[in-house]
Amino acid sequence: MERPLCSHLCSCLAMLALLSPLSLAQYDSWPHYPEYFQQPAPEYHQPQAPANVAKIQLRLAGQKRKHSEGRVEVYYDGQWGTVCDDDFSIHAAHVVCRELGYVEAKSWTASSSYGKGEGPIWLDNLHCTGNEATLAACTSNGWGVTDCKHTEDVGVVCSDKRIPGFKFDNSLINQIENLNIQVEDIRIRAILSTYRKRTPVMEGYVEVKEGKTWKQICDKHWTAKNSRVVCGMFGFPGERTYNTKVYKMFASRRKQRYWPFSMDCTGTEAHISSCKLGPQVSLDPMKNVTCENGLPAVVSCVPGQVFSPDGPSRFRKAYKPEQPLVRLRGGAYIGEGRVEVLKNGEWGTVCDDKWDLVSASVVCRELGFGSAKEAVTGSRLGQGIGPIHLNEIQCTGNEKSIIDCKFNAESQGCNHEEDAGVRCNTPAMGLQKKLRLNGGRNPYEGRVEVLVERNGSLVWGMVCGQNWGIVEAMVVCRQLGLGFASNAFQETWYWHGDVNSNKVVMSGVKCSGTELSLAHCRHDGEDVACPQGGVQYGAGVACSETAPDLVLNAEMVQQTTYLEDRPMFMLQCAMEENCLSASAAQTDPTTGYRRLLRFSSQIHNNGQSDFRPKNGRHAWIWHDCHRHYHSMEVFTHYDLLNLNGTKVAEGHKASFCLEDTECEGDIQKNYECANFGDQGITMGCWDMYRHDIDCQWVDITDVPPGDYLFQVVINPNFEVAESDYSNNIMKCRSRYDGHRIWMYNCHIGGSFSEETEKKFEHFSGLLNNQLSPQ
């Protein structure tokens, strides 16, 4: 039944009247971010909580989740705990998400939907207005006062959009010996000209900020353990001795301002704020007694190999790690990633049970970084593959390697959703100041501009977009502290901003992806050559906090491989799509056949965001044979190589349609090929290419019997950004006798040590009972 127009209009107006004040109240409680649309992005400083509010940390945990959602866990009084869902609201969820660096909350969940937590239930009957600076400022029953069980643990779903410039405060500011003394700001101030001219700063006075004044710490009770903690905070793995005579002479020339307390560290702390307060220093400026006639405390730090100082001399005693038994994978920055350990020649992960800053710091120092600023849990830096080597690690902090720590070799109850990671302190190199993005719609995108020296002056200019790719964009985003690259643009249509920077000053850029800065990549130097020229051909990037990570199921390839002699009259689609070897053109179409090496491939997305094709819908290609669109022309390579690495046959699969075939647990499928659907692979899902579909093969009709290597490479041209490209290659040993084929030892590249990998490539026998080893 139709209603009169007036009735509709009145209802709408009434609804607007009800919603308007609610919307205004809601928006009034949110912080405003006008700077989000300005360049450059200022560093975000979280609103200060009242002095009487407890200092806490938050994290999201649980299984089957994205990085921006999970069970809410609170670190308070030295212990992680959960929050009860009683009286929880979207306003409280907003506070949680903003405290974790997300712009807002999308929703919240009750009844332990992300699994039951452990430890105390810190907060119950929580009431927030939505404008609190921290969850601790909301009203509740009090810390630990609850009648809830862990079946009522609350969870939140935050927006993927990050607050621009947000910086995590990863170290809890400890109240030293219950006094109102907080060591929040500390620095190493280079005193000698030798160190003032070098980056990073590795030697100088240790200074603490008291109010607005920087003050020195008296060395009367200063120890090497204190120095170790300070060096670790600033990204250095250890400390060393220094020339005291020079500093005595320098200190005698000027009056010092001393902090009235000393520190007492054990050397295992991740931050000096965790150290105890030492004896109070006797200071009496009226009687000219300062620091009990001592000197300002000095530290001299040992740099990791990656961060050895610039200059022709370099440091001969720079920290050089031995053959690594530990590595980091999947991180956006140097010194960040999922922890992987080498055991019995095979790389495996670490379970996050009992994972803490002390153990994480051992890993960081072992790799040549400083102490850990965060012990990452819940596979928030992506899931690994292979075995879980270590569980329930408990380090004292003095170990040289994580394998020296106590641990449980049994990993029962652990899975890769619990892979541990680290974020290490790294030295401040000042590299962010030499690069900027201009003209973007937000701080995470724009035209790349570099600061270079020309004719004795520093000038800003563009980077030539010719041959610019995702690997180069990755280096830019990392240098700027903006995470991973999501897109690399060879042409940019951004607002040009500073007209003085419209000149191309860098060209021919080629990066390996591991460089600290764009300047460390190969480029043309001052011999700039950019044939296309023009402002629109300046290189551009779009950055993202997260990235996907594709991994092939090697076991499935090994289990599903077989040979098929397929008649030519059944290969018409394959001929049209050029999926056969060149000799197929001479094969009789009525009586001839082709010998096909067939297999299934299952490609998982183990990363922290969805894998999306580079091209938009407008560039997808329709395939009549398959009756759907293909979104990526080159998604995987299938190659058969001889033992010298020479290609003897290859798959010619023309292009690919990406979709979610299956997903883990309760993860929802988002992509499908049918009906011109959206294409991609959701985080936690996989795309299955069955052995019986067209072009899922390698044509080996012309290949003679022998021993070979079978190789599959995902995303071979790096068209789409991933958090880890090292696991995109799968290799198998294969033996073909002219009638049958055996596939064995299939594994992902980088799964084994270099020594084991060499043995694999030169071993000519099978490891199963189908054929005897030679």
From Swiss-Prot:
Claim: Transport is one of the keywords in the record: no
Residue stretches in coiled coil: none
Lysine tyrosylquinone (Lys-Tyr) crosslink, residue number(s): 653-689
Intracellular or extracellular location(s): Secreted, Extracellular space, Extracellular matrix, Basement membrane; Nucleus; Chromosome; Endoplasmic reticulum
Single GO MF descriptor: oligosaccharide binding
Signal peptide positions (record): 1-25
Glycan attachment sites: 288, 455, 644
Residues annotated as binding Cu cation: 626, 628, 630
One GO BP annotation of this record: endothelial cell migration
Any Gene Ontology CC annotation: collagen-containing extracellular matrix
Keywords from the named record: Basement membrane, Calcium, Chromatin regulator, Chromosome, Copper, Disulfide bond, Endoplasmic reticulum, Extracellular matrix, Glycoprotein, LTQ, Metal-binding, Nucleus, Oxidoreductase, Repeat, Repressor, Secreted, Signal, TPQ, Transcription, Transcription regulation
Comment field on protein domains: The fourth SRCR domain plays an important role in optimizing the catalytic activity of the lysyl-oxidase like (LOX) catalytic domain.
Quaternary organization: Component of some chromatin repressor complex. Interacts with SNAI1. Interacts with TAF10. Interacts with HSPA5. Interacts with EFEMP2.
Other comment: Its overexpression in a number of cancers and its ability to promote epithelial to mesenchymal transition suggest that LOXL2 might play a role in tumor progression: expression is correlated with metastasis and decreased survival in patients with aggressive breast cancer. Allosteric inhibition by AB0023 inhibits formation of the tumor microenvironment and reduces metastatic tumor burden in xenograft models.
Protein purpose: Mediates the post-translational oxidative deamination of lysine residues on target proteins leading to the formation of deaminated lysine (allysine). Acts as a transcription corepressor and specifically mediates deamination of trimethylated 'Lys-4' of histone H3 (H3K4me3), a specific tag for epigenetic transcriptional activation. Shows no activity against histone H3 when it is trimethylated on 'Lys-9' (H3K9me3) or 'Lys-27' (H3K27me3) or when 'Lys-4' is monomethylated (H3K4me1) or dimethylated (H3K4me2).
Family: Belongs to the lysyl oxidase family.
Stated name of the protein: Lysyl oxidase homolog 2
Protein source organism: Homo sapiens
